[in-house]
Every structure is written in C-alpha cells, then in structure tokens.
C-alpha cells in the first residue's frame, strides 16, 4: 500500500499525523514490488553489455559530452539514477570496482536475477526472511565451491597472468589490440609486484597511466620509469641527461612578492637598475644553491622565472616547471629523492637518481621521460589512440586489466570463465538444496537458477540459443572432470575454458557473488519506503529572508 502521509489514531479515534506534509510512504508488498522493479530496470540496462560479445552504451550528459563504453562502473556512474534501490546497486558496483577493479556487471546483473527469482517465490507466499536465509546458505556454498575448484597461481606464471589480462580485455572496445595491451599489463604488474613476508603485494599507484591523443592503440607503450607531461622550459637546456641527479622542488624559482602591500619609490634610473640587479642576484643565488648540490635535473611544481631559466641553462641543468603534485610524489618514490619546499634547505641527500632523463616528442607534444630510477617498482603506460574517446576507453580497459591481474597476484588463485564456475556452483547447489529441505530449499534452487541466468545472458549476447546450450553445459558438468567446461561465445561450442585461456581471478567472482547476495537480501528485507517531501522554492526563499532579517536585528 501507499499513502501521501502516515496517520495514526488514538483509542478515541482522533487522527495523529506523523510525517510532514508532502511526504509519502509505501509499505508492505507494494514497497517490495517497487524496489524489485527498480533493480530489474538497472539490470536490464546492463544485460546487453555482459560478456566479450556484449554491446556498448552511448551516454550523453547534461552538457552534451558523449561517453561510449561497456564498462559497468562507468555506465552506472554516468546514469542519473533517482530511485533509492537503483542507487544501492550503483554503490554495490562502485564497491566492487574499488575492491577488485572488475566484476561490476556480474555483481549488478546477478543482483537483478536474484531479486527476480525471489519475486517468483514471493508470489508463492514464501516469506522474505526464508528467502534471505536460503540465499545466505547458497552464498556460503558458492564461495566454498570456488575455493575448492580454484587453481593456485604465482607471479612467475606469466602465461596464466597474460590470459587473465586477455580475458579482461576481450569484453572491451579495445579487444582488437588486446594481445599488445595484455603484454603491457603483465610487464607492468610483474615489475611493481613485491614479496612481503609470504604474500605478494601490488600497489597500483606505482603504475602511472598517461594519455596522449594521436597514433593508434598499438602505439601504446610501457616505460620503466615516470613520464612528466611537460616540456623542458628553456631551449638552451640539455634535452638528454644521463646519470641524472634530480631535485624535486615544491618551491618556485621566482622572486617572491611580499605578503603585505608594499610600495617602492624610485627617484632615478640607477635605483631601478639596482632593484632589477638585486632580483637577478636572488634568482642566481637560488640556481647556484641547486647547482652546488650536484643536481643536473630540476622538476619544479611551481613556476621558474625566465632569468632563473637562463642561469639553469648556463649550468647545463634540465628543468621542468608546473609539474603535477602527484608526479612529484611518484618521482620521490621512484628515484629515492625528497620533495623540498625551501631551496635553502636542499642538500645532495635530497636528490633522486635515474639513469636517464630525456625530452621526447610524442605526437605534437613534448614530454619528459625519467627512466632507470633508483626504485624499479615504478612504471608508466603511455596510451595512444586516434580519437580521444578511444584513448579514454583504452584507459578504462587497462585499469580493469591491471586490477584483475593484480588480484590474481595478490590472492594467488584463478578460475575459468565462460560460465564454467556458475554452472558448477549451480550443479552443487541443486544437490545441496534437498539436504536443507523446507521452503529454504526453494530459495537455494532459485539461487542456482539465478547463477545460470548469468550463463544464459552470456550465450544470448553471443547470438546463440541459450536454452539449448545451457542444457548441453549442464550435461557436460555431470562429469566431475569437466568443472572448467563453459561456453565459447565466438563459436557456440562447449569447451574447456581453462585450456582455451579464458581465465579470471577467483577473488573477483567471490566478491561479485557476495556483493550481489548482500544487495538482493537487503532489498528483500525492506517493507517500508518513506520519502520526505521536497522543499518548495517559495518556502525556502521565505526561510532565507527570515534568517536574514534575524541577522540584521
């Protein structure tokens, strides 16, 4: 039921209004039905993008900016969703993306399927609490199954890591260049991975991504160092410095203006000359101080005066100005240097080291490359592409691929894709359900059906008959040795996905299942939807005027 205001009555029958005027309340089955409809609507929007043969979405914002993508997190982020249940799915997707960098569509679509199956059980008068309990038991069995069937992988298994990257990239718009991009991803992750105790750790902040419009996706390259998207400030400076000693400055190489307003009265031209000479001496002293430390490269976050540029060039020092703060922080980690805020405090111990600093022309722009840094746990990926939208989509694809390969390295477990895991879990859930018995059995079977719905969507997006292939896939999984059998969405054949190279991180699948189960059970538990009334502009204006009057009094 729904109502525009909540009204209670006293024993004498006198009505008591609880909510403000304009508020609305929907409760009981009607509230559940509305929430389920909202979740299903979001799922429908993402369904066609699922899998390597999924379609793309064109999203146009209020300013007319266009985004073409099939990245689940990006689509949901760009959609201006209003319903609270739909917003909940966006939060689930963001959490999944931040946690594992992939599996957002799996989490959202699976949430939608779980809610759909629950709706069917609700029509059979099965209470939501029983459905939630059954779903939780099914989730535990699903996670246990993945842990049992997953395969151990180490950072040295580069071929498996490459297949993980290829699997992630195959569903993106950049699939045509996936071989080249997969190699870059694996090289980047194996470079920055480090062993801490008995576990591998990957800090993706050590992988810098720089975008530059022009060329093609196949021109994308990995650089074992840091790229500063700036050019050398003075034409007289060297464009290449070997055995670079790098000063990282968070201070300007300019004459600082006084904080207070000050006037200088000049009575004759000689005083003016003295004033300018003094400014020049201040800048020269700053440059001399830098040179005394042995620095031959300066990366400055702030400005560099033309006079300072001249003196730096005379001393053969390569300088870059207006560098990003994040670039300075990355350089500090990579080169072993320290960012200094006061040039007078700069010493030789603050300098970073790199074997090569060089300015290179990329397309129409010049960039500074710092390679062979003291700490090798820092790499950069320079993305190229003919269109800006292609470059943006390549960045999204690379971030997902980097995240999935990093997940495998950190967790050390991988599984096959192509619907193999979902089918295997569904098979085990159907055997497990009768052991639980009662109405919960129906909820566990519904959970299994929801998992298989993911497989059917995968098949459907590949252009094949989902019912026919799902029956064949179920039959294949009856044999215990066929746990990795799934759907080849390019041929429509049932094949061993592991042998085919369709490999995914186990942790991504587990997180997606947990997130989807949590979201669906949360929605099923809601039986009351209370919406506050919107403030009218008139009332808001009157309130502001009254507040203003009080302030004046």
Curated annotation (Swiss-Prot):
Cross-referenced PROSITE patterns: TCP1_1, TCP1_2, TCP1_3
SUPFAM superfamilies, alphabetized: GroEL apical domain-like, GroEL equatorial domain-like, GroEL-intermediate domain like
Organism domain of life: Archaea
Pfam families: Cpn60_TCP1 (PF00118)
Keyword list, A-Z: ATP-binding, Chaperone, Nucleotide-binding
Assembly notes: Forms a Heterooligomeric complex of two stacked eight-membered rings.
Entry function: Molecular chaperone; binds unfolded polypeptides in vitro, and has a weak ATPase activity.
Protein's name in the database: Thermosome subunit beta
Organism: Sulfolobus acidocaldarius (strain ATCC 33909 / DSM 639 / JCM 8929 / NBRC 15157 / NCIMB 11770)
